[in-house]
Every structure is written in structure tokens, then in C-alpha cells.
Amino acid sequence: MALRILITVSLVLFSLSHTSFGYSPEEVKSWCGKTPNPQPCEYFLTQKTDVTSIKQDTDFYKISLQLALERATTAQSRTYTLGSKCRNEREKAAWEDCRELYELTVLKLNQTSNSSPGCTKVDKQTWLSTALTNLETCRASLEDLGVPEYVLPLLSNNVTKLISNTLSLNKVPYNEPSYKDGFPTWVKPGDRKLLQTTPRANIVVAQDGSGNVKTIQEAVAAASRAGGSRYVIYIKAGTYNENIEVKLKNIMFVGDGIGKTIITGSKSVGGGATTFKSATVAVVGDNFIARDITIRNTAGPNNHQAVALRSGSDLSVFYRCSFEGYQDTLYVHSQRQFYRECDIYGTVDFIFGNAAVVLQNCNIFARKPPNRTNTLTAQGRTDPNQSTGIIIHNCRVTAASDLKPVQSSVKTFLGRPWKQYSRTVYIKTFLDSLINPAGWMEWSGDFALNTLYYAEYMNTGPGSSTANRVKWRGYHVLTSPSQVSQFTVGNFIAGNSWLPATNVPFTSGL
């Protein structure tokens, strides 16, 4: 009997030590050794007292996600106290960006943690990739305005590393076969109809008073009182000098056509804004759709970064739209995006960001730059497990009217690596003679040349020859459909699961 009691007490004490005092050092080292950043994993896992059993990889993934969420929530709470410590307008502007971006990070981590049964690993990888991108954007805002990082000490490398660990544990193959043929399948049938017909508007914007409201922002505000279903804002022909923020889900902008319905702004880094806040139109709410609209930033070629559109909207679609600016025109910030039959004008890094984005049947126009060099893309992937990249499929790359007379004196490149794992692919795209024979340009010395992924597949036109392209380890000339299939609409942005509902035409494969 005494032996039985002793064994029982020993088992209870072992159980208490395991549940009340954290994981054993052996467990911690074994599991954290599977991540790219074991040190913060070991530290925070050791500190954890509300432990749950780790028996398999899925258990560890859940705990890794929980650690990232806990640290991100702590970092977010600190941002609220930092506003009063800002010493000038530049520091305040950077702080406001970081506050918003940490809120979005916590939102995405919660979305990943509390995802519905229908949520796929691709969805989770998208949201984790976005959470990581948000933290990087906070740092970029400090750099834009020359604010030293010690002024805003919320920038926790631990949060970044913990999210990176969770990304590596989710392990999504790029060609996961979970979609049907047709449009990217995240587009619902009702949304598809909206894009193929003239939809009935919930509200009409008209400068002459013939609509319900005179400004677009008024219409967006009205949508907040309408519930969460698809809300169509018809914007009549005219030039609207506004800076628009769309934070609600399921908003649709419908205009009267490119060059007819024009939204214009002029904020820029040169004028004191961050790149993030310079956008004429900024969209965060998921499932955003825009059709038949021009969006401009008129800050000019010498005011540095000046964004026309910034989209961080998951499952967003832009159809027959024009984006016009110079440096950093189209900010494909994060999440899954699709552009069809759009025009994009710019000079330096004018398609940039860290979304999983496909541009299909679009016209890309390089303008006359201030410094005799154009770069079409600057993709911002910071982690090898982020499911992000810029895919340019069946588009046309040509010189804009202001560049044509001086084209021979300007070097125009397909892109350059903004971040360590930058990924950009051109597929079956017409490249005119403006493209430099080297094709691609360095960002700074040999930075990222071995870790980037740049590729070309069956492009045409006088600028498409790969004979004199760069010889970087990360550059690839693809020669077979199997090599490029992971970058199609169907696979790269899971287009077959959401695009059909928008009624935007798209090509799922090559």
C-alpha cells in the first residue's frame, strides 16, 4: 500500500511539474531545433506556464502560433504609450504607421489561430506572411522619415522571429492541388456577375450633385452603416481630389472608365508622408473590387515614393483600372491580389510590395525617370517561407509617351531585389526594346543575388532575349510548363477558389 501511494504521489508531482512549471529543457531544445530561429522559441517556450502536451508537429505549430500572438499582442499594447513620446511630426507619422500595422498583425495572427474549418494551409500561410510584412513595413516607415529605431523601441525582433518560425512549420507546397478550374476560386459567383455587368449601386457619388453624395469618402463612410454584405459604390465621371482609406470588407468601386472616373492625390515621402501613408487610395478591407477607374498620384518624379494605390486587401480584384505615378506607383502591400486588363505607369520600383499577386493582360508603361534608370518591380519578400511574389503574365511592357523620345539614354530593368528573398516572374509577356539586355538590376552590391528568385518564361518582343541576362544564382530561365505552373493564377494565388465569383475574366493556367 505504501509503495502504491508513493508511486501515485510521484506521478502527481511529475504531472504538476509538467503543467505548472513549463516544458522540460529536453523538450524545448528538441522542438525548437526544428525552427529557423530556435533561441526566441526556447526562451518563450521555457517561460510558458500554461503548457499543453506536444505530441506531434501540429501541436507544436499551434503553440508556436500562440507564442507569436502573445508577443505581438504585448508589442501592440506598447505602441499606444509611445505616441506621447514623439518629438516631432515625422516621429508621430512613423508611430501612427507602426500602431496601425501592429494592430493588423495581431488581427492576422488571431485570424490564423481562430480560422474556420474551411480554412486551408494556403490561407494560413497568406495571413502569416502578411503579419510578417506588416512588421517590416513599420521598420520601413521609420527609414522613410529618418527616424532612428531607438525612438520607437517597439520593434521586437522576437515577434518577427516567432512568426517566421510559425511560417516554417506550416509548410505549404506552392502547387497544392486544392482548386478547381476557372477563375481564382475565391471570387464568389455574385461578385463575378458584378464585374461582367453594370451592377446596381448601393450609393452613387457625383460631383455635380446628381448622386447621393459628392465625395468618395462619404460613400465609404455610408457603407459602415450598411452591414457586411457586398456594397457597391458607383463613382460617376469626374476628377476626385481625395485620399481614400477603405477598411471595410466587401466594398466595390465602379467607375465610368479609365480616364473618366479619376481619383487623384499628391502625398509623397518628399512631402513628409511615409510611403505607407502616401497612397491616394489605400485598401485594407478584404474582398475589395475596383472596376473602370483611374487612380493617380501627381507628386511628380522628384518627390521620391508617392503611391497611387496601396492594397493589403485579401482576395482583392482590380479590373480595367489605371494606376498612374512615378516612383512606387502600385503598392501591392500584402495578401492575395489579382489585376486584369489594367494600366500601370511609373519610373522607379513602380510595382512593389510583398503580396501574392498576379497581373494578367495588363499594360506596363515605363515613364521618363529623373535619374536615367527605371526599375519596373521591387518585390519585398523577407522570409523564404512567405507565399508571396509578383507574377506578370501575358502583359505588355512598353515605353510611355514621355520616355519614347529619350528611350536610348535611359536604362530600364525588369526589377531589383528590395528584400532578401525577392521573387518576381515574367510569363509570356511582351517586352519591348526599352528593356536593358541584362534584364535585372542590383539593389546594393551583391545583396540578395543568391537568395532572390527571378525568372522568365516564354516572353516575346525585342527586349525578351535572355542571352545577355544577369548571371546571378537566383536568376532562372524557365523552359517547361512544369517549372512555371506554381506561379499561375490557379496555384500561386489559389485563384480558382475565389476569382470566379468576381466575374473578372482570368486564365487559371499558362
From Swiss-Prot:
Alphabetical GO biological process terms: cell wall modification; pectin catabolic process
Catalysed conversion reaction: [(1->4)-alpha-D-galacturonosyl methyl ester](n) + n H2O = [(1->4)-alpha-D-galacturonosyl](n) + n methanol + n H(+)
Positions contributing to substrate binding: T275, Q305, R416, W418
GO cellular component: extracellular region
The keyword Glycoprotein belongs to this UniProt entry's keyword annotation: yes
Glycosylated position list: N110, N158, N371, N385
Enzyme class, spelled out: hydrolase
Active-site feature positions: D328, D349
Compartments where found: Secreted, Cell wall
Tissue specificity annotation: Expressed at low levels in young leaves, young bark, young fruit, mature fruit vesicles, shoots and flower buds, young bark and juice vesicles. In both leaf and fruit abscission zones, and mature leaves, expression was initially undetectable but increased markedly following ethylene treatment.
Any one GO molecular-function label of the UniProt entry: pectinesterase activity
Disulfide bonds: C342-C362
Transmembrane segments: none
Principal location: secreted
Highest taxon of source: Eukaryota
PROSITE patterns from the UniProt entry: PECTINESTERASE_1, PECTINESTERASE_2
Note: The PMEI region may act as an autoinhibitory domain and prevent untimely PME activity during transport.
Function: Acts in the modification of cell walls via demethylesterification of cell wall pectin.
Sequence similarity: In the N-terminal section; belongs to the PMEI family.
Name assigned to this protein: Pectinesterase 2
Organism: Citrus sinensis (Sweet orange)
Lineage: Eukaryota, Viridiplantae, Streptophyta, Embryophyta, Tracheophyta
